[in-house]
Amino acid sequence: NIGILTYYRVANFGANLQAVSTYYYLKNNGYNFVYLYESDDTVKNFQKKQANEIQKEEHVHFVDTVIPNQSFVFNANDINRAINEYNLDAIIIGSDAVLQHHPIRARIKKGKRKPFYIEKMVSERIFPNCFWGCGISEKISMAMMSVSSQNSEYKYFGKKLSRKMSETLSRMK
């Protein structure tokens, strides 16, 4: 039994197609699985700004039609509950740009009305979060598949942060 933690119910063709191809691979190879979709009101509000509603609805309708096994989770506690509820043996994290981190220094932007402002960011784009495996039970095996840290400005990562990220990633098997 495998849980797939990814960000696929979005207006993004790549995320949709990765989720669907993973679905068919697991289904055709006899695995039992459930998609764990992490979302909260902050993410929903952010998504509304990113795509028009009709396009987003079509993307979500597409993946909901193809992928029947879905569980909505909002934090690590929900993921740990899903591990028990679905008797999961492992979790696959990914794919797509789920390993992002945008430190505050990278989010300082030149403003039009003010000299500068700090760009808001949803929690899923700041380390630590569940996509890095943070807060998920140590008892379960986890692996990452086709993940990226797209648009993360590494030059702003300090040594302590980089070390903590490395420790977190070492849990993956």
Where are these regions (language model features)?
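A short beta-strand/loop micro-motif in the catalytic core of glycosyltransferases
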Residues: 172-173
